[in-house]
Regions:
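A short, Lys/Arg-rich alpha-helix, primarily the initiator
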Residues: 1-26
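Residues at secondary-structure transition points
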Residues: 8, 12, 55-59, 63
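Conserved hydrophobic/aromatic packing and binding residues within compact polymer-binding modules
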Residues: 17, 31-32, 42-45
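The alpha-helix within a helix-turn-helix
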Residues: 21, 32, 69
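Short alpha-helical "recognition helix" segments of helix-turn-helix
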Residues: 27-35
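Recognition helix of helix-turn-helix/homeodomain-like DNA-binding domains
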Residues: 36-60
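DNA major-groove recognition helix of helix-turn-helix/homeodomain DNA-binding modules
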Residues: 59-77
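Helix-turn-helix/homeodomain-like alpha-helical modules used for DNA recognition
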Residues: 82-85
Length: 85
């Protein structure tokens, strides 16, 4: 089952991502790589601490991603699979 949570600010995003990171075995912290902005979709890749950086992606801090999303007039939803069926 998919769970969607509307993200209002950076603090809430960090909290939700930490829950997600911990459930996948990552340590606290991490980076977000903004990959693409398209209509209704902003794609980004989340990496744990010390990600391999091949120099081809630009790293954005979470607050920068939030600012970009709000500037473009989007709402941000974090969608994740819920293991409970």
């Amino acid at each position: 089952m998919r769970k969607a949570t509307e993200i209002i600010d950076e603090r809430q995003l960090v909290s939700e991502l930490h829950i997600n990171w911990k459930s996948r075995g990552y340590t606290d912290g991490g980076m977000a790589d903004l990959l693409e902005i398209a209509p209704k979709t902003i794609s980004y890749k989340l990496s744990g601490i010390n990600p391999d950086n091949n120099g081809k992606k630009t790293h954005f801090k979470l607050n920068e991603i939030i600012q970009i999303i709000h500037y473009l007039g989007f709402k941000l939803y974090l969608v994740r699979e819920d293991d409970a069926k």
